[in-house]
Each structure stands twice: as C-alpha cells, then as structure tokens.
Amino acid sequence: MADDLVEGLTRAGLPGAKASARYVRVSPTKARRVVDLVRGRSVSEALDILRFAPQAASDDVYKVVASAAANAENNHSLDPATLWVGEVYVDEGPTLKRIRPRAQGRAYRIRKRTSHITVVVESREPVSAAGRGAKTTRRAR
C-alpha cells in the first residue's frame, strides 16, 4: 500500500514520511482496534489519544506514529504542527505455533499472532478555527 511513497510524497501527492514496526507480538485484530482510533487525526492529537488508551497495543502504535513524525521532521524537514496521520494499517505477520498439553495425552495448538504496523504521515495545512465551524448561507429556492 504505502510502498508508493517516493521521495517524501504520499499517494495523495502530499509531502510525508513512513514508519513501520514488523513482527510485533500483538494480534492484528487487537492492533486494528487501536489504529482505527487515530486514522485521519493530527499527529499531536493521535499521540495524546494513544498515550491514554487502555489497550496494550496502543504502546506499539504510539512508537510507530512518533517514529513516522520524527522521520518527516528529520528526513524531509516538515513542520511537526502540520503533520496528519494519513494512512495507517495493520497486516498479519507470521504466527508462532505452540502446544498446550491437555488431558489423556491430547494437545491443543496455541497460535501466538504477530502484526506488521505501518503509519504514513502527511503534511497538510492546519484547518483554521473559523473555517471549521463556519456556517454557509444557502439561497432560497
């Protein structure tokens, strides 16, 4: 998906940066619950949400979002105040298979799932406070 990130431009054509964490020992479904909280938000707001989210996966997602923001700032000289979480997704990594002994010689298989977390931040102009809640007048029909 985000492999199209060439020379600091996202797929939308905006300047940005990418970071990913691979083989993270958290279930992809649990990580996706956390990722959905921050998609489309500003980086500062996303980091605040992740800092106080009760899910265990929020720590791993926090590190990746912070790393993507640092990549944008250091590698592409982008202003941290204009960064937004543009694209964020979780792919399934390899599954570690373990055995749990059960009664009468049986064994149950335990699947320890891993995830690949990818975050793409992009630089957008901040929305002004007046533009966000401004009312537009409609003509009478």
UniProtKB/Swiss-Prot annotation:
Biological processes, Gene Ontology terms: translation
Pfam families: Ribosomal_L22
Coiled coil (residue ranges): none
GO molecular function: rRNA binding; structural constituent of ribosome
Superkingdom of origin: Bacteria
UniProt entry keywords in alphabetical sequence: Ribonucleoprotein, Ribosomal protein, RNA-binding, rRNA-binding
KW Secreted (keyword) present: no
Keyword Lipid biosynthesis (UniProt): no
One cellular component (GO) term of this entry: cytosolic large ribosomal subunit
PANTHER family: CHLOROPLAST 50S RIBOSOMAL PROTEIN L22-RELATED, LARGE RIBOSOMAL SUBUNIT PROTEIN UL22M
UniProt subunit comment: Part of the 50S ribosomal subunit.
Function: This protein binds specifically to 23S rRNA; its binding is stimulated by other ribosomal proteins, e.g. L4, L17, and L20. It is important during the early stages of 50S assembly. It makes multiple contacts with different domains of the 23S rRNA in the assembled 50S subunit and ribosome. The globular domain of the protein is located near the polypeptide exit tunnel on the outside of the subunit, while an extended beta-hairpin is found that lines the wall of the exit tunnel in the center of the 70S ribosome.
Family stated for the protein in its record: Belongs to the universal ribosomal protein uL22 family.
Listed HAMAP family: Ribosomal_uL22_B
NCBIfam families in the record: rplV_bact (TIGR01044)
Name the record gives this protein: Large ribosomal subunit protein uL22
